[in-house]
Regions:
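An acidic, glycine-/histidine-flanked metal-binding catalytic module
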Residues: 2-12, 16-18, 142-283, 358
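Charge-rich, low-complexity segments
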Residues: 1-74, 81, 85, 211, ...
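Short acidic, glycine/proline-enriched loop segments that cap or flank alpha-helices
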Residues: 67, 134-136, 247, 251
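Generic, well-ordered alpha-helical scaffold segments in large soluble proteins
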Residues: 29-33, 93, 194, 201
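Amphipathic, soluble alpha/beta structural segments
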Residues: 113-136, 176-209, 286-329
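Long beta-strand-rich cores associated with HINT superfamily self-processing modules
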Residues: 81-197
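The conserved glycine-aromatic submotif of the RRM
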Residues: 75-76, 120
Length: 358
């Protein structure tokens, strides 16, 4: 008579291809559902337990499995989020879209005593449910279960390091090292909490910037991006440069961020100073930009291009070639071997733009 273990392994070999289809399908579904929710996660993995791994699990002293269906982690999917609060948002999607086996699902965070060493994650045992098994080829998947793990990226880092070190229980750790493990666990949990808080604060600040019309605020990525996207003056100047050059005008996050250091280099640290400088030099900035872009092989320019030429123009306006050269070298503008000539050309073009009749 075959043992339970042998029967399960035999059933596994017959159904392993179905479990592979199941894990891949759940992974693809989650990817689409998470994207539809407007969430961005670090990664989604799927796997099927290997035969050797299954055999070891079945032969553990406390194993009590009698059939393949008793094992709920043959197919597995892992979702790793950037933020711990997104773990709960992914969990909401899973509860809404899949049939959850609550008896076998685990919230590991709820199992932790305050003084117990360990870390958090959610484990849901699910089946596809009727909404995701409408097609005939999916019917054979309906009775199968899979385990979905959800962790933040820091929770995942802890779990991986913990596994690599080989200590999953605080009692297995040498007593003189337990405090160090506990401190590390607490630090990671605190870091998760702080990253969540930072994201919330950045969102709130972004809303404050959007509402702060006419209020002077410091220059940073959020405030400058808002000006580039929504500021009337910058939009007018950028559009004029686009119209005169015929180049496509696009917004790219990296370009907006690169302007911050350039503005700080020329002494602009507040939006009020930027606004005043642009307004005072609006005509010369557009003429300078249009002249400088003549003959270039660019197919497009970036929103905020007027600010880029404002920074260069401020230095050209001073006539200080050494300072302009330092600026070009700092931001790696122009060919290194020709930067002196490039700097002189910038000054000449700016002076010419400042005298439209010259």
């Amino acid at each position: 008579m075959m043992s339970y273990s042998a029967r399960i392994l035999s059933a596994y070999e017959k159904k392993v291809s179905l479990y592979e289809i199941l894990s891949e399908k759940i992974s693809a579904l989650l990817e689409g559902l998470i994207q539809d929710e407007g969430l961005y996660v670090h990664s989604i993995y799927h796997r099927v337990k290997q035969r050797d791994s299954l055999s070891r699990k079945l032969n553990k002293p406390d194993a009590s499995y009698k059939k393949l269906g008793d094992l709920t982690d043959i197919a597995g999917v892992r979702v790793i989020t950037y933020f711990s609060s997104d773990v709960d948002r992914v969990a909401d999607i899973i509860r809404r879209e899949f049939t959850v086996d609550t008896e076998h699902s685990i919230d590991k965070g709820a199992l932790l005593d305050p003084d117990r060493f360990g870390y958090l994650s959610l484990h849901y045992v699910v089946s596809l449910g009727k909404s995701h098994t409408k097609f005939p080829q999916d019917k054979q998947l309906a009775s199968l279960k899979a385990e979905i793990q959800i962790r933040s990226i820091l929770q995942h880092a802890w779990a991986e390091i913990e596994h690599d070190l080989g200590y999953k229980s605080k009692h297995a750790i040498p007593i003189h090292m337990r405090r160090r493990f506990s401190r590390l666990s607490g630090l990671l949990e605190l870091a998760d909490y702080e990253f969540d808080g930072l994201r919330t604060n950045l969102r709130e600040y972004s809303e404050e910037v959007a509402a702060a019309q006419g209020i002077d605020i410091p220059l940073d990525k959020i405030s400058l991006t808002h000006v580039i996207k929504h500021g009337d003056l910058v939009r007018m100047l950028d559009n004029e440069i686009r119209n005169q050059t015929g180049l496509e005008l696009v917004f790219e996050d990296w370009f907006a961020e690169s302007l911050i250091e350039k503005l700080l280099f020329v002494g602009i640290s507040r939006l009020s100073d930027l606004e005043a400088g642009l307004r005072h030099r609006s005509d010369v900035i557009t003429r300078f930009a249009i002249e400088h872009l003549k003959g270039r092989t660019y197919s497009r320019i970036h929103r905020g291009v007027s600010i880029y030429y404002f920074c260069t123009g401020l230095l050209a306006e001073s006539g200080n070639e050494d300072r302009l050269l330092e600026y070009l070298e700092t931001f790696r503008l122009g060919e290194p071997a020709n930067r002196k000539r490039f700097a002189r050309g910038i000054i000449e073009k700016y002076q010419s733009a400042g005298d439209p009749h010259g």
